[in-house]
């Protein structure tokens, strides 16, 4: 035997070494577990905060929409108040002449048209000969006419658009095919 050879470890030494390794491994795993638990708790907290923030944002958005619906017409209503004032003033006159009534009605109509225009309401009043547009016109009847077929002959009632969306189509008569 050479001097460099160590005697084989005894079973007790092997068991002690394994116990020491197991204890070290257990300590390492317990430390890792504690670290992961802390990270998990932190992530759970972050999740709950994010969830609460999302819920608050949703609630704020719902409140904003409710307020917009409730007060969205406020500007439009304010623009109609001068029209109401003019009508009240006209009704207060007891002995108005037909000419005064006509002038007052014209002025009130101009106020109303101005209020509609300020609120982006546009009149649809096609001229005779305009091509019939089913998106903006509603044909009430077709009549024989000396113009191209499917064109407007006359307007029975004006239509209105708001931001290119039809509020009411113009009621028109349309030239029948020849």
Curated annotation (Swiss-Prot):
Any one cellular-component term (Gene Ontology): cytosol
Origin superkingdom: Bacteria
Entries under Gene3D superfamilies matching the protein: 3.90.20.20, Head domain of nucleotide exchange factor GrpE
Segments of this protein annotated with the region Disordered: 1-23
GO biological process terms held by the UniProt record: protein folding
Main location (coarse class): cytoplasm
Record-linked CDD domains: GrpE (cd00446)
Pro residues bias locations: 1-11
Subcellular localization(s) per the UniProt record: Cytoplasm
Keywords assigned by UniProt, alphabetized: Chaperone, Cytoplasm, Stress response
Pfam families attached to this UniProt entry: GrpE (PF01025)
GO MF annotations in UniProt: adenyl-nucleotide exchange factor activity; protein homodimerization activity; protein-folding chaperone binding; unfolded protein binding
Oligomeric and partner information: Homodimer.
Function: Participates actively in the response to hyperosmotic and heat shock by preventing the aggregation of stress-denatured proteins, in association with DnaK and GrpE. It is the nucleotide exchange factor for DnaK and may function as a thermosensor. Unfolded proteins bind initially to DnaJ; upon interaction with the DnaJ-bound protein, DnaK hydrolyzes its bound ATP, resulting in the formation of a stable complex. GrpE releases ADP from DnaK; ATP binding to DnaK triggers the release of the substrate protein, thus completing the reaction cycle.
Xref: PANTHER family: GRPE PROTEIN, GRPE PROTEIN HOMOLOG, MITOCHONDRIAL
Family: Belongs to the GrpE family.
Protein name, entry field: Protein GrpE
């Amino acid at each position: 035997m050479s001097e460099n050879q160590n005697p084989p470890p005894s079973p007790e030494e092997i068991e002690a070494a394994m116990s020491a390794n197991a204890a070290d491994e257990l300590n390492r795993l317990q430390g890792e577990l504690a670290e992961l638990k802390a990270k998990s708790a932190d992530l759970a907290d972050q999740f709950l905060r994010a969830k609460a923030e999302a819920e608050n944002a949703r609630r704020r958005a719902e409140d904003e929409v409710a307020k917009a619906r409730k007060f969205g017409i406020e500007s439009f209503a304010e623009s109609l108040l001068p029209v109401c004032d003019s009508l009240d003033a006209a009704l207060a006159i007891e002995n108005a002449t037909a000419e005064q009534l006509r002038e007052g009605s014209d002025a009130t109509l101009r106020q109303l048209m101005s209020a509609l225009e300020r609120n982006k309401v546009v009149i649809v009043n096609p001229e005779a000969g305009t091509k019939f547009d089913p998106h903006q016109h509603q044909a009430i009847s077709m009549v024989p006419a000396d113009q191209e077929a499917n064109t407007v002959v006359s307007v029975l009632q004006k239509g209105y658009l708001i931001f290119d969306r039809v509020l009411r189509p113009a009621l028109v008569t349309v030239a029948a095919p020849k």
